[in-house]
Amino acid sequence: MNKLHGMPCPNVINLSECEDRKRYMASKFAEYGVSPVFYSYSRFEDSDNEIVGDESAIALTSKGCFSSHLLTIRDWLLNTEDELGIFFEDDVDFETVKYWNFNFDEFIASISDDWDAFQLCGIYETYPLMIPRARKFWDHGIQCYILKRSYAQRLVDFYFKDVGSKVMHYSMPQDLPPSVENNILNGFGPTLTFPLFNHNINDFKSENINPCIDNYNQQTGPSIFSYRLIEAWWRITGSKLTLQDIIEGKGK
């Protein structure tokens, strides 16, 4: 079974200096016969992109992450006619895929149609409810998600005032804690979440989280905890569940 059968062409967001991550993502997709499109970006401070708006709010966001996701989504809208777009950062872990007892196409078809965006990878500070469900603003992680075309258009219209501009107008679409997840995955239509994939903390030489360190900082602690949690759930529980079991929450 090709587990990624039916997946739309992946749009992979990559920091241009991190060639190892690009090679990793290309090799993983190649294992499943999938050819992604890569979007490689310089660091925000080295680019000609611009974010305008409330300076105090902008200071709280990751400008490179925010801008690269929006530019990628806009490019997908302008250059495809696909009804579904799937977006990856370059640090997605694919080990969960071997535990799926279904393929990607079957998973999407099993979900009722009342969603416009779907978060497919998360970083969790506590044990999440392991069932496809409505995303909450504390569901962190922007590593992988699907957008319907209509949702993506509303999002792009909100942040870009001119079609070809590299100027993004920063504002939270709802009164929520500022984060790129909430910029992208809140406020433009119903959003679901379920961790089909995991956050990769292991496989890179470029700057990333080291799972072996003893002194966890504010970022590494939740990321390592979450990685181990999701990996264990898929290996121990998810691998024994049918797709219908997952949809019905029998492994939650």
PLM regions with names:
Residues M1-F88, V92-K252:
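An acidic/histidine-cluster motif and surrounding catalytic segment
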